[in-house]
């Protein structure tokens, strides 16, 4: 399957993401602890933990830090009895947005999430309002420059659902989330080095963003990601190469 240019859509946010690296690490550690507590410390037997481990490594977290977080979870440190909460809503331009949180205080979390939606021209919805538009999948991403046929052959042989090649040469491999770890291991063994690997919520439809709505959507994402309790933000906003170029 072919797609638009991917790197133009993401590179303009890289500097902001790098500036948030400390906060990103805190959130990943929280997920590692919770995943290990709920499903055990073996990533091969715990898909949620495996996804957290791969995300940690994609963000250049050291093995020592990663292993300490897993040990905390196995040892019963739950960081204040955290629970996973999913919020759903609509963002600028009618975008569907899902917000995955880890929280020990629902009232605090929903207040912060609702504030971000309201501030950016969106609104927080009810359970199920947009979830039907998303499917949970593993996503293994490769930067431009790899042999597309080699990635596709290795991915499909390993049990991937789909391989998307973009106009700029970037490649995304989609897997069932339950077998994400096994597919990633097979691709690693084939010598294919991923740019990133994570379990995500993939939208079934896209909402096209224009020069007016795109910056508003990015502001909403940034505000949500600034919330300590927010782990992930998923949306179906699509930013064209032309619009992305105006945001850099």
From Swiss-Prot:
Protein name as annotated: Probable transcriptional regulatory protein NT01EI_1596
Signal peptide span: none
GO biological process: regulation of DNA-templated transcription
Keywords assigned by UniProt, alphabetized: Cytoplasm, DNA-binding, Transcription, Transcription regulation
UniProt KW Repressor keyword: no
Gene3D superfamilies (alphabetical): 1.10.10.200, 3.30.70.980
Family named by the database record: Belongs to the TACO1 family.
GO function terms (MF aspect): DNA binding
Keyword Transcription regulation: yes
NCBIfam families on file: PRK00110.1 (NF001030), PRK12378.1 (NF009044), YebC/PmpR family DNA-binding transcriptional regulator (TIGR01033)
Entry coiled-coil feature ranges: none
GO cellular component: cytosol
HAMAP family, per the entry: Transcrip_reg_TACO1 (MF_00693)
Any one Pfam family match given in the protein's UniProt record, by short name: Transcrip_reg
Principal location listed in the UniProt entry: cytoplasm
Organism annotation: Edwardsiella ictaluri (strain 93-146)
Subcellular location: Cytoplasm
